[in-house]
From Swiss-Prot:
The keyword Transit peptide does not apply. FAD binds at residues 11-16. It is found in: Cytoplasm. GO terms for biological process: tRNA methylation; tRNA wobble uridine modification. SMART domains: GIDA_assoc_3. Its cofactor is FAD. NAD-binding protein involved in the addition of a carboxymethylaminomethyl (cmnm) group at the wobble position (U34) of certain tRNAs, forming tRNA-cmnm(5)s(2)U34. GO terms for molecular function: flavin adenine dinucleotide binding. This is tRNA uridine 5-carboxymethylaminomethyl modification enzyme MnmG. Homodimer. Heterotetramer of two MnmE and two MnmG subunits. Coiled coil: none annotated. NAD(+) binds at residues 271-285. The gene is mnmG. Pfam families: GIDA, GIDA_C_1st, SAM_GIDA_C.
Length: 625
């Protein structure tokens, strides 16, 4: 029997689900292969979505027609907007999610997406013919043929879990690892290595003394990750709880370090710098007497809690003893211990910006296989890989995002141009155009691109136009409406603001950092009437978007001009068959890096570590500039 598809997606994690859903929505016949259909989009670590820079990625995924934002909104049990005390370029949405409902919501999407089919199995190897992928062969011996394959294998390629001295093969607790794909691709010349990540114990909430913790509730107004107006039932909101380790806890952990895989030589791989294990914390920060932890609820009604900040691969008995040294956890019962896991990843400089591999045509990688960490980073890559897998099948060009267009663009460019030597996670500091990549306007930046390829439906387009019309109407009004001191000063003085000495435009008044649009509405009835025309469910979002554009107009224009200047280098393409090793005028390091990465444009070459401005000038001469 022959089974033929346009796109095969291997793995149904966050990257795989976005890839499969996007390709299917665009019209490809898609097969999603997973060893467990009951664990689609499993939240393998903490039950949360978003956070600093990650929340922006989720909004970008939604603006492009992806599903992570919609699923998060439907399953959120707490919402917070982080960094509100800073400028809007730093605002980052974050939500606690009901883990089980999150998987159920994704399963519902996958099952009801036309053109998307599932197969429960694992993949043994790829079918590759004449340098191009042709399908996969599963552990059951079934061969599926396809014009493109997207690998989103997470931590399952060669996965080995560490529970103290005990080592168990697996990609997740109680789930087997995959073998065969890494070995096959290595034989084809792919560069591969190992990385490590970890997860903490899960705790029974009935054994926690919450009176000895600090409650952290969410925000009362129910924000959304999605720009869509999809109806939803708001789940019962749950709090998180803060607590701290102490010297007694640290002493117990220290005595067990000789049994820690991280310190006895058992683990050789590099773990995530910004999510260190508790063992790493007490060694690296030996002078600190306490480290903050957070108890995060796993669901709307669940007693299970995730202990954020206590990732560990120490033996169970040491983990348990150390936890019981914390007053709130004196009588703790755990559902399962923390553990570390090592897995295979592939050097992402072997990818193009479409996430297609350079050595094998039609083969795409997304997620942890590229050396990243995080649900959001994986989902963003999956979406781009799924779009491009579809376009590749139908000879319809390619879809990429620039560093000035999306955090997803920054993420992929960093991977492709710089590579990774540790698990990569996104931060706002990685983006040079943060003011252009705000979470409030991802729809303005990206939904037109989704419309152009057919990924945005008509309702999404309607909502974008509505937002644009009302936002521009508000801004236009502020440019035209003049304020007289005798009318506005009583309001300003009663609110503690400096009075006006002469008449000014409303726009100029709003440039004052301490004065907001909502406050001005109470002073200017005609502005209030425009605000009241906006649908109530979107009023706060649209007013906020207009206010940000007014207050940060100068900064936005300056950053846009800088981005446009750099983008001119993006249009200068490098010849792909030049022998850089023969270009003696380039530095030795530049020759090596350019040969290995083979950048597509001058701009990409300029971002490669080791390629100097002098090297870039030589490349410009090569391109006839």
């Amino acid at each position: 029997m022959q089974f033929n598809y346009d796109v095969i997606v291997v793995g149904a994690g966050h990257a795989g689900c976005e890839a499969a859903a996007a390709a299917a929505k665009l019209g490809s016949q898609v097969l999603l292969i997973t060893p467990d259909m009951n664990k689609i989009a499993q939240m393998s670590c903490n039950p949360a979505v978003g956070g600093i820079a990650k929340g922006q990625i989720v909004r970008e995924i939604d603006a492009l027609g992806g599903r992570m934002g919609i699923v998060t909104d439907a399953t959120a049990i707490q919402f917070r907007m982080l960094n509100r005390s800073k400028g809007p370029a730093m605002w980052s949405p974050r939500a606690q999610s009901d883990r089980m409902r999150f998987m159920e919501a994704w399963r519902d999407i996958v099952e009801h997406e036309p053109n998307l089919y599932m197969w429960q199995d694992s993949v043994r190897c790829l079918s590759i013919r004449q340098g191009a992928v042709a399908g996969v062969v599963t552990a059951l011996g079934v061969e599926f043929q396809a014009r493109t394959v997207v690998l989103t294998t997470g931590t399952f390629l060669g996965g080995v879990m560490h529970f103290g001295e005990r080592m168990i093969e697996g990609g997740r607790i109680a789930e087997p690892a995959f073998h065969g794909i890494t070995e096959q691709l290595r034989d084809l010349g792919f560069r591969t290595d190992r990385m490590k990540t970890g997860t903490p114990a899960r705790i029974d909430g009935r054994s926690i003394d919450f009176s000895l913790t600090t409650e952290q509730s969410g925000e009362e107004d129910h924000h959304r990750f999605s720009y869509m107006d999809t109806p939803r039932r708001v789940l019962r909101q749950r709090s998180c709880y803060a607590l701290y380790t102490n010297p007694e806890c640290h002493e117990i952990l220290s005595k067990g370090l000789d049994r820690s895989p991280l310190y006895n030589g058992q683990i050789q791989s590099i773990g995530p710098r910004y999510c260190p294990s508790i063992e790493t914390k007490i060694v690296t920060f030996a002078d600190k007497e306490m480290h903050q932890l957070f108890l995060e609820p796993e669901g709307e009604t669940s007693n299970e809690f995730y202990l954020n900040g206590f990732s560990s691969s120490l033996p169970l008995e040491i983990q348990l003893e150390a936890l019981k040294a914390i007053p709130a956890l004196r009588h703790v019962h755990i559902y399962r211990p923390g553990y570390a896991i090592e897995y295979d990843f592939f050097d992402p400089t072997q990818l193009r910006h479409t996430l297609e591999t350079k050595p094998v045509k039609g083969l795409f990688f997304a997620g942890q296989i590229n050396g990243t960490t995080g649900y959001e980073e994986a989902a963003g890559q999956g979406l781009i890989a799924g779009i491009n897998a579809h376009l590749h099948c139908h000879g319809a060009g390619e879809f990429t995002l620039g560093r000035d267009e999306a955090y997803i663009g920054v993420l992929i460019d960093d991977l492709v141009s710089k590579g990774v030597d540790e698990p990569y996670r996104m931060f706002t500091s990685r983006a040079e155009y943060r003011i252009l990549l705000r979470q409030d306007d991802a729809d303005m930046r990206l939904t037109p691109k989704a419309e152009a390829i057919g990924l945005a439906d008509s309702r999404r387009s309607e909502l974008l136009r509505e937002k644009q019309v009302f936002r521009d109407k508000l801004i236009d009004f502020t440019h035209k409406f003049s304020l007289k001191p005798d009318l506005i000063n009583p309001h300003l003085e009663s609110a503690g603001h400096l009075p006006l000495k002469q008449g000014i435009k409303l726009y100029d008044l709003l440039l004052r950092p301490q004065i907001g649009m909502n406050e001005v509405c109470s002073m200017v009835p005609s502005l209030q009437r425009i605000v009241e025309e906006i649908p109530a469910s979107r009023r706060e979002e649209i007013v906020e978007a207009a206010e940000i554009l007014i207050k940060y107009d100068g900064y936005i224009k300056r950053e846009r001009a800088l981005a446009d200047k750099i983008n001119r280098l993006e249009s200068i393409r490098l010849p792909q068959h030049v022998d850089y090793m023969q270009m003696q005028s380039l530095s030795t390091e530049a020759r090596q890096k350019l040969t290995s990465i083979r950048p597509e444009t001058i701009a990409q070459a300029s971002r490669i570590p080791g390629v100097s401005p002098h090297d870039v000038s030589i490349l410009l001469v090569l391109c006839g500039r």
